[in-house]
Amino acid sequence: MLTRFQLKDVAGLFSEGVEPEPQLAPAARRRRRLETLRESVPAGVRRFAMVAFNLLGRRELATLPATLDLMIRDRFIRSNVLPDPRAALAGEEGLAGLAPDLSPATMMEAYGVGLNPSASLGPVAWHSPPIRRVSTPGKLAQSPALRVEGPAKTFRATFDRDADSILAASANRGDCASLTPERLINAFAELFDAGYAHSFEVRDAGGRLVGGGYGVAVGRVFVLERIFSRRPGAAQVGLQRLAQCLRDWDFALVECGAGAFDLCGEAFDDVSRDFYLASLGEHLRGDRIGRWPSEGAKRNPPGARQPRAA
């Protein structure tokens, strides 16, 4: 069962050696978050245009009737029961059903059965693609696709220091892979407050944010949701450091979500949905809830390890 934490309790989640951020008053933090994560009118128009392009694109046109039928039925039925990930529609998106509830508890339950939230087809919905991209942390850390060269060698990666800025930057990349409406961004922000979602920030030698990303820890599986890069090599620096720390913290698997595939997909292997769901089921126990050490201290698993109910 997911344990919900209030903002005032977050400091108590920190692992030993984690430097707490300067604490804002709850009202001030809410205002800052609303300003940071608000979707602008131009961004909303651009997102809807991309959705239309995605729906009418050649790859998805064959499944459009079934997609619209499922969306219409779900809109009227409004069931809070999660769909079966194995019964998702055919097609690359793997649409399984709409997502009327994005509470932390429901989000974590969905991730635990292999459903990922996405708005690539318009409304926020649960998806279970037939092909999943995965890697072990150790293999990912050594991937040639993440080799860092040139100025990027001076970049520095940290964890959980500026999640709101990372969420906003990842949602405003301006491409089909980053279709993230305000409702879904705020749901990820709540998961961060609850200690399940994590961000990584990549900065240059001058302290400027040049890249980063975020994902969700589900037991010993990390689902990489989004990644962005403002400078060559920034995404590789962040993902390589993430993989190194996940390896040291005994994570078993990393999944690359659709919102991260275009920047780092070469570092992952394609597997079937059934293979991924079976692997996920083997590694659900042992949630580590809480903020990660900002520097990713080795051999120091973050947060309190809590077993999941069978």
Regions found by a protein language model. Name each.
Residues M1-A310:
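N-acyltransferase acceptor-side catalytic subdomain
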